[in-house]
From Swiss-Prot:
SUPFAM superfamilies: YWTD domain. It comes from the Eukaryota. This is Major allergen Mal f 1. Keywords: Allergen, Cell wall, Secreted, Signal. Residues 1-22 form the signal peptide. One of its GO terms (cellular component) is extracellular region. It comes from Malassezia furfur. Transmembrane segments: none annotated. The keyword Secreted applies. The lineage of its organism: Eukaryota, Fungi, Dikarya, Basidiomycota, Ustilaginomycotina.
């Protein structure tokens, strides 16, 4: 083989390598009218995003490669934008190769502070994966009875369900953001809904947990916001006491915390929470007795309704993206562009 031919082959290989390792996009443009995604998660196995259409109470499935999408409607809960329930959170049973997707539906009056109610329908739904336009829940539960039980035990009524997480056995945990900090537990088969944990709030308009996630490496459930930055719970028992996590670093204000997600980094877990305009990461070496933190921000997130962080992948490349609901659009404002903004993923490295 001639020397020039070898050089040409090497150049071609170099070009291919560069294309494989091309940088992740600075933003991913999701163009769906009136989407208002309060939560977004990426299914690495199927290479699609699941997004919660807040006001319509639907699951939006978006393929970033083909820029195509479809909706999944929940009978009796979804609407055209003015229904009794709104979709506030999504979670996968496992990070990779997940067999189930879960959807949290809050009551529309929960966060309507001008006409607020702690009662009314709110629900939780389990879907088999993969999804199609015709997918229906495998099972669904409502929270009114467990709210009544919390009220009897604690003297206050939690409401405003915002996010869910699943443990190794497939049990689900759903966080309440309003009334008081509380977590309901739903059995893997959806047949039992029970009071799992609660505590006194620190006052204010939103005393409960704003987010919740599960760390499979430590077998701990972690709540975000409310009384403190992080609170850990032991899922090995039917009821759990809140375990405050000591934060090593300057967390800042509790006001404005939103959702939190577990991101796998090597064989460990890093948690990343949203509090506009910051994405805040947490790493623990002592089973969540304490945690170190890092922060990153983007100016676009200051007034975008930044509510969640999603980890996204192109091949072996891992990135973090900020999810913005753009609440100012309302249910029928006509907005059709809901960008996901790339974050500095060095906050994953401790």
């Amino acid at each position: 083989m001639r020397y020039s031919t070898v050089l040409a082959a090497l150049a071609l290989l170099g070009t291919s390598a560069v294309s494989v390792l091309a940088a992740l996009p600075d933003q991913i443009d999701v163009k769906v009218k009136n989407l208002t995604p309060e939560d977004t998660i990426y299914d690495r196995t199927r290479q699609v995003f699941y997004q919660s259409n807040l006001y319509k109470g639907r699951i939006e499935v978006y393929n970033p490669k083909t820029q195509s999408h479809f909706n999944v409607v929940i009978d009796g809960a979804s609407s055209n934008g003015d229904g009794e329930q709104q979709m506030s959170g999504l979670s996968l049973l496992t990070h990779d190769n997940s067999k189930r997707l879960f959807a949290v539906m809050k009551n529309a009056k929960s966060f309507n502070f001008a006409d607020q109610s702690s009662h009314g329908a709110s629900s939780f739904h389990s879907f088999n994966l993969p999804l199609s336009e015709n997918s229906k829940p495998v099972w669904s539960v409502n929270f009114e009875k467990v709210q009544d039980e919390f009220e009897k035990k604690a003297g206050k009524r939690p409401f405003g369900v915002v996010q869910s997480a699943q443990d190794r056995d497939g049990n689900s945990y759903v966080a309440f953001a309003l009334g008081m900090p509380a977590i309901a537990r739903v059995s893997a088969d959806g047949k039992t809904v029970s009071t799992f944990a609660w505590e006194s709030g620190n006052g204010g308009q939103r005393p409960g947990y704003s987010g919740i996630t599960f760390d499979p490496h430590s077998n701990k459930l972690i709540a975000f916001g409310g009384p403190r930055a992080l609170t850990a719970f032991d899922v090995s028992k039917p009821y759990a006491w809140p375990e405050p996590v000591k934060i090593n670093g300057d967390f800042g204000t509790l006001s404005g915390t939103e959702k939190i997600v577990t991101v796998p980094v090597g064989n460990e877990s890093v948690l990343v929470g949203a509090r506009a305009p910051y994405a805040i990461s947490f790493r623990s070496w002592d089973n969540w007795k304490s945690a170190n933190i890092k922060k990153t921000k983007r100016s676009e997130l200051q007034n975008s309704g930044f509510t969640a962080v999603a980890d996204y992948y192109q091949g072996s490349e891992q990135g973090l993206y900020a999810v913005s609901a753009f609440f100012d659009n309302g249910a029928h404002g006509g907005r059709s562009d809901y960008p996901l903004y790339k974050l500095d993923n060095s906050i994953l490295n401790f």
